[in-house]
Amino acid sequence: MTSGTSRGPENESTSPGLPGSADKDLAGHADRVRRGYLLVSGLDYFADMLLTVTSVLLLQSLGMGSGAVFALIAAVWIVEGVSEIPTGVLADLLGRRASVAISFVLRAIGYSALFFSGNVYVAAAGVLLSALGGTFASGALEAWAVDETGAKDPSGLDRLFAQGKIAENAGLVLGTLTGAALGTLDLALPQIVAGLTCALAAVLSLRLMTGRRDPDRPPAAPEPQAAFAPRLRESFGEVMTGTRLTLRGDKVLIALILAAALLWLFRGIPGVQWTVVYEGLVGGNLLVLGAMRSVGSLLEIPLLGWTLSLQKRRASARRTVIVTASTAGALALVCAAAVKEPALSIVCYVCFSTAFGLCMPGVRAAMNERIDSGHRATVLSVASLFNSLFTGGGLILTGLAVGDLGSTALAWPLAAAGFGIAGLWVASLAVRPGTAPTTTTSTTGSTGPQEVRAP
């Protein structure tokens, strides 16, 4: 594929001072992109985490039973899953900035619906609309940051995603504590604040997500509005073909996607139950629940800084971090389900959630190393598709087997075993070099991808 920067003679200069100036401009642009990525990521998590303590309690207060809550959360994951590929195509077709802005607008509407309506069906529709909105940003923001910063090497990717995780954790902590505090006044109040935050984030994403022309994609020729639908179908076919060829040419990438999906599944099961499990243990105090949810994310910030410095010194450190974190997380979740002392159980659960957060930057960096830039957003959406379908299906099975959101005797030990095994699998793949050969397509048509370069 061609690069996103024209290399013709008319764009080159013989001035000896220009290369250094150009390097400074590129470095300054990368810094601006990184700051924009961190700010938008932080706002994204702040808005979502405003609801982490109160959302299930709000749905129950509207008359939704435990089984229905389990089914609704599973439906959220499934909606996200089936929407991932179409919205990934739109991200590549319409532009990643527009896709992220659409995501925030849809979530602003969905979150606000839960505030303005006391009807359980309207509330459920708002939850599903918010889930749909989330898929527009899935992969698009990440792909934009990787391409615009030029972070292609392992150390650059690890640094970008570690910093992104820190920004996400900052948003998570602030959002969780703010939502818990607002929830003590009214369970619906965090919803409207989340909606307003998403509206603000939509404006900021349009202002901040600027930069050079998308890499590996020539400028689109102007076309009439009526041609949009054919272009969408054509783009969908091209990207799906490119994704299929990329995955077929890189078995390690396929395995990474599947293993990461298992990590999300086994993190998702206790993630649904924790509010109900610990509400009685803390006497229904939402601020305590918010603090409990935030402690793990606060711990991640210095730990991520330490793991980043370790990875700079040792190339194999990524695997060490994932193995250690997944093993410790699995043991912690078993202890959280088994121990009778509430305080100890809370500490163990916090350790489990922290371990998951430490695994993810390395997993995301390993995937991005192996994805061709031209279809990065869509391939990342394919990964999110597997995450969503695995987790949604797993939650349905868990709901049928457990039946009660507050029961951990069966679900948490099984989730712990799966989490540990998936972590070891991911770790075995995360430091393998991308060696898949370049894959070309036949030239029988002009609409298919001309080349899919294996990273």
Task: Give the predicted meaning of each segment.
Residues 2-9, 70, 81-92, 97, ...:
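C-terminal transmembrane bundle of multi-pass solute transporters/carriers
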Residues 20-81, 249-297:
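Helix-loop boundary and gating motifs at the non-cytosolic
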Residues 42, 110, 121-137, 344-358:
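Hydrophobic core of transmembrane alpha-helices in multi-pass small-molecule transporters
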Residues 80-118:
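Conserved MFS/SLC helix-loop-helix module at the cytosolic interface between two early adjacent transmembrane helices
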Residues 105-119, 327-340:
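C-terminal ends and interior cores of transmembrane alpha-helices
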Residues 127-169:
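Cytoplasmic helix-loop-helix junction between adjacent transmembrane helices
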Residues 189-207, 411-428:
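Symmetry-related core transmembrane helices of the 12-TM Major Facilitator Superfamily/SLC fold
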